[in-house]
Amino acid sequence: MPKLKTKSGAKKRFKVTATGKVMHAQRGKRHGMIKRTKKQIRQLRGTRVLFKTDGDNVKKYFLPNA
């Protein structure tokens, strides 16, 4: 049976660390930021770790070879 392909949308959105955690970028920074405070915009920088169950699902269904 051939290997499952990685979903290309998931490749762009998620990154798996060496310890197996799944990182993702914060949502809500594309548009409409005029109504947010500077503090809110600043706190949306960087990446966050997905919850373990969500990360397991992402690895199983979208990033099978990660």
From Swiss-Prot:
A single BP term in Gene Ontology: translation
UniProt key word Ribosomal protein: yes
Classification via InterPro entries: Ribosomal_bL35, Ribosomal_bL35-like, Ribosomal_bL35_CS, Ribosomal_bL35_sf
HAMAP family tied to this protein: Ribosomal_bL35
Stored NCBIfam families: rpmI_bact
Keyword set includes Ribosomal protein: yes
Keyword annotations of the record: Ribonucleoprotein, Ribosomal protein
Transmembrane segments: none
A GO term from the CC aspect: cytosolic large ribosomal subunit
Superkingdom assignment: Bacteria
Single Gene Ontology MF annotation: structural constituent of ribosome
Protein name, entry field: Large ribosomal subunit protein bL35
PROSITE patterns according to UniProt: RIBOSOMAL_L35
Protein family (similarity comment): Belongs to the bacterial ribosomal protein bL35 family.
A Pfam family hit: Ribosomal_L35p
